[in-house]
């Protein structure tokens, strides 16, 4: 009996910290089991790019997903924060899949909208204040080739607050945010990554050795 328990423990030890059953993740996200297997191969590549511990550290995350991976950027930091659901400074496989699923084409817009609201709510107060909006607009511009002056960014923020803050309390609440998104659906454009609909085609080399079937 003891030998059996040891054998079972050794078998379970093959999975790194944070690993979750693909079938469970498939039941909670738009991804299929095979797609999650493909994402696991991608996750392994990312999580060993700098520190080989089966977890994605911020440096690895920024290097893989942002063109200015070596630079500090509030937007990049916020995305990492949102992926790090346990708030322990690293991204585990389950967190990676669940957070990435927000960007899936089949994920409802209200979920994408809620994710983006939290992204902009820097202090977690349930509101987006003008200074938070200004910081995030500047950070988003940092990921593009578009350069705007401080005055231009402030003008964008002032105009947005004027149009969105309907109850005139000086901040944007969740209902006001929903109305903004409803009137301007293009706001969520970057919240959808089309290739996630066909992960196994986007990353064909990752699934050659997969033995999992849906």
UniProtKB/Swiss-Prot annotation:
Transmembrane segments: none annotated. SMART domains: EFh. Its main location: cytoplasm. GO terms for biological process: calcium-mediated signaling. The modification Phosphoserine is found at residue 205. Acts as a calcium sensor. CBL proteins interact with CIPK serine-threonine protein kinases. Binding of a CBL protein to the regulatory NAF domain of a CIPK protein lead to the activation of the kinase in a calcium-dependent manner. This is Calcineurin B-like protein 8. The lineage of its organism: Eukaryota, Viridiplantae, Streptophyta, Embryophyta, Tracheophyta.
């Amino acid at each position: 009996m003891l030998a059996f328990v040891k054998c079972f423990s050794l078998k379970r030890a093959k999975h790194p910290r944070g690993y979750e059953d693909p079938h469970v993740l498939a039941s909670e996200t738009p991804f299929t089991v095979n797609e999650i297997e493909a994402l696991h191969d991608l996750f392994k590549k990312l999580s060993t790019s700098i520190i080989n511990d089966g977890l994605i550290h911020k440096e690895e995350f920024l290097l893989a997903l942002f063109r200015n991976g070596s630079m500090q950027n509030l937007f990049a930091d916020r995305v990492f924060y949102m992926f790090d659901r346990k708030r322990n400074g690293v991204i585990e496989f389950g967190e990676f899949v669940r957070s990435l699923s927000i960007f899936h084409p089949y994920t409802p817009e209200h979920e994408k909208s809620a994710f983006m609201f939290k992204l902009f709510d820097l202090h977690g107060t349930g509101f987006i204040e003008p200074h938070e909006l200004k910081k995030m607009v500047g950070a988003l511009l940092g990921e593009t080739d578009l350069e705007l002056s401080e005055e231009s960014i402030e003008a964008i923020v002032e105009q947005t607050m004027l149009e969105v803050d309907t109850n005139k309390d000086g901040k944007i609440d969740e209902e006001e945010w929903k109305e903004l998104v409803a009137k301007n659906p293009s706001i969520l454009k970057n919240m959808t990554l089309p290739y996630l609909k066909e992960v196994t085609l986007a990353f064909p080399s990752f699934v050659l050795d997969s033995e999992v079937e849906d």
